[in-house]
């Protein structure tokens, strides 16, 4: 009798999404992002010789002295003129544009772009309706900048809660202004560094969401696209912003304005940032929770305080842009907040950089979004915490640029924290807009997709898309080919909900404020913190049953 009473007093289990038990266990290898191909040993040695000309044997030194120095061509441009024939619905050579450049023949759309377009599922009608948007997304997809900004590091084993820690600290941060002590790395210089990367290896395509996070209604992409590695660096000049014609510039072998930092200079700079001492004497009970391409993530206990932390151990020799790690550490060190997974400490241990971060055992919000159903009060609570983090970052001139459920970590107490500053940008009042294309496509703001100058409100758009994730289990257009998804983001405006009638009027208004196409009318983090929807927020402890239910569902599906 008492047992039956106890059972009646227990609250009902949180509702699970229909897809939680229909997953292929093989999908639980969370390698959602493709890893770059390992460069050939010969290429590695050649690159090292180019960076450290003093190295090598005496014979090579003698040959180097005998060889005359010939400078690289500078400011070389390959201009491509693309027009659009409204009658045939085809992209054609732009005869007018070619006349503007004497001696150049009209070329039309590059062959690799034509191949991308054929497999993109963008219909002829859509191409005819907005050819400029098509060119914008083709330029993005073909851009090496996008390839170099992919988060290559994804863990292959261990606790899924490691996800946010493994993705963080990638050497792909771009900063518009440098924090103290950091070497100046301008946007243009960073792009030139990317051009020097080995072009022989094919770039990875934009990875769709892992199969286990898709709903039962999600169609797989019909055909994967192999993105050609074309060094496409210059933004479309204002004079060429025309719906029927655009001039695109391909720069090759541009002369470097400033040389890269040497390994010794990078180590010297890191020594001025990191703590002195042996971290093995400060932390104990190391437990591996994840493995990535350039490092390993462990949990450990701080001996003095008993605090559980996450420690990422990165082999510096395997980091493609070691100098940018400095910028990221400084940005994170200077921006601490209760709603951010905070940087705690760092150490140099031999050839490794150890970065110590807060540890949240609840895992990423993606687990909760894909495995359970959240109500509006719980969604409001998550949105409030994220907006508090964004308000703090934006007030400190930092744009996150990759807001999505994967980058929100949860504590078992329901705490909500923003992580992964691999794409973050620091801006100044003098340079309050940026125009680089970074982030994850399905969460991107339209102004980012179309390569316009943008500000902190790109994070607000992404937050709105993440709110849709919390309602529907996935972002809009996830079932589309990535290239077509970019086109739809650029042209459709605010995405439509599957069942808007199920949402309250105040929630729909909140989404509309986040997903406003007109950036000036889109709410800021500070403004949205006053939105009536956030008054519906439940206590953060209401997220704990969802976190437990998500972990249980993942555990059961892996059996």
Curated annotation (Swiss-Prot):
Q: Which GO terms describe its cellular component?
A: cytosol; glutamatergic synapse; postsynaptic density
Per UniProt, ATP binds at 289-297, 312
Q: How is its activity regulated?
A: Activated by binding small G proteins. Binding of GTP-bound CDC42 or RAC1 to the autoregulatory region releases monomers from the autoinhibited dimer, enables phosphorylation of Thr-436 and allows the kinase domain to adopt an active structure.
InterPro entries attached to this UniProt entry: CRIB_dom, CRIB_dom_sf, Kinase-like_dom_sf, PAK3-like, PAK_BD, Prot_kinase_dom, Protein_kinase_ATP_BS, Ser/Thr_kinase_AS
- What organism is listed for this UniProt entry? Mus musculus (Mouse)
- In Swiss-Prot or TrEMBL terms, this protein is called Serine/threonine-protein kinase PAK 3
Summarize the protein's role: Serine/threonine protein kinase that plays a role in a variety of different signaling pathways including cytoskeleton regulation, cell migration, or cell cycle regulation. Plays a role in dendrite spine morphogenesis as well as synapse formation and plasticity. Acts as a downstream effector of the small GTPases CDC42 and RAC1. Activation by the binding of active CDC42 and RAC1 results in a conformational change and a subsequent autophosphorylation on several serine and/or threonine residues.
Under catalytic activity, the entry for this protein gives:
L-seryl-[protein] + ATP = O-phospho-L-seryl-[protein] + ADP + H(+); L-threonyl-[protein] + ATP = O-phospho-L-threonyl-[protein] + ADP + H(+)
- Which gene carries the instructions for this protein? Pak3
């Amino acid at each position: 009798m008492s047992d039956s009473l106890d059972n009646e007093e227990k609250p009902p289990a949180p509702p699970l999404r229909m897809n939680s038990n229909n997953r292929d266990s093989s999908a639980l290898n969370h390698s959602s992002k493709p890893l770059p191909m390992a460069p050939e040993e010969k290429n590695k040695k050649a690159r090292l010789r180019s960076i450290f000309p003093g190295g090598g044997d005496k014979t090579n030194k003698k040959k180097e002295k005998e060889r005359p120095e010939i400078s690289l061509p500078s400011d070389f441009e390959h201009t491509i003129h693309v027009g659009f024939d409204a009658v045939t619905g085809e992209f054609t050579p732009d005869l007018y544009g070619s006349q503007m450049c004497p001696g150049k023949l009209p070329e039309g759309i590059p062959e690799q772009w034509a191949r991308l377009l054929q497999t993109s599922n963008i219909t002829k009608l859509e191409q005819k309706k907005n050819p400029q948007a098509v060119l914008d997304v083709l330029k993005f997809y073909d851009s090496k900048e996008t390839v170099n900004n992919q988060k290559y590091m994804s863990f292959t084993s261990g606790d899924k809660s490691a996800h946010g820690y493994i993705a963080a600290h990638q050497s792909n941060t771009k900063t518009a202004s440098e924090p103290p002590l950091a070497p100046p790395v301008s946007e243009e210089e960073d792009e030139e560094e990317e051009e020097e990367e080995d072009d022989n290896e094919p770039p990875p395509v934009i990875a769709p969401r892992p199969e286990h996070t898709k709903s039962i209604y999600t169609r797989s992409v019909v055909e994967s696209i192999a993105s050609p590695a074309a060094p496409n660096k210059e933004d479309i000049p204002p004079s060429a912003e025309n719906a029927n014609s655009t001039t695109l510039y391909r720069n090759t072998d541009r002369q470097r304005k400033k040389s890269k930092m040497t390994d010794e200079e990078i180590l010297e700079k890191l020594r001025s940032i990191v703590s002195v001492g042996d971290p093995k004497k400060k932390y104990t009970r190391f437990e591996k929770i994840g493995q990535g391409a350039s490092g390993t993530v462990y949990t450990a206990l701080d001996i003095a305080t008993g605090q559980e932390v996450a420690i990422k151990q990165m082999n510096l020799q395997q980091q493609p842009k070691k100098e940018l790690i400095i910028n990221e550490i400084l940005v994170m060190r200077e921006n601490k907040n209760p709603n951010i997974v905070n940087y705690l400490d760092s150490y140099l241990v031999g050839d490794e950089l150890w970065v110590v971060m807060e540890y949240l055992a609840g895992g990423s919000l993606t687990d909760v979004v894909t495995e359970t159903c959240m109500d509006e009060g719980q969604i409001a609570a998550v949105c409030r915490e994220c907006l508090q983090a964004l308000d703090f970052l934006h007030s400190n001139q930092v744009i996150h640029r990759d807001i999505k459920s994967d980058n929100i970590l949860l504590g078992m107490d329901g705490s909500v924290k923003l992580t992964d500053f691999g794409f973050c940008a620091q801006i100044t009042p003098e340079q309050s807009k940026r125009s680089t294309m970074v982030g994850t496509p399905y969460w991107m703001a339209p102004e980012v997709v179309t390569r316009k100058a943008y500000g902190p409100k790109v994070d607000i758009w992404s937050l709105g898309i993440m709110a849709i994730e919390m309602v529907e289990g996935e972002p809009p257009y996830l079932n589309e080919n990535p290239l077509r998804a970019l086109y739809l983001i650029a042209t459709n405006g605010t995405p439509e909900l599957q069942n808007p009638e199920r949402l309250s009027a105040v929630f729909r208004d909140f989404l509309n404020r986040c997903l406003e196409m007109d950036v000036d009318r889109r709410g800021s983090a500070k403004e949205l913190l006053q939105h009536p929807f956030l008054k519906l927020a439940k206590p953060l402890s209401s997220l704990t049953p969802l976190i437990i239910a998500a972990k249980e569902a993942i555990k059961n599906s892996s059996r």
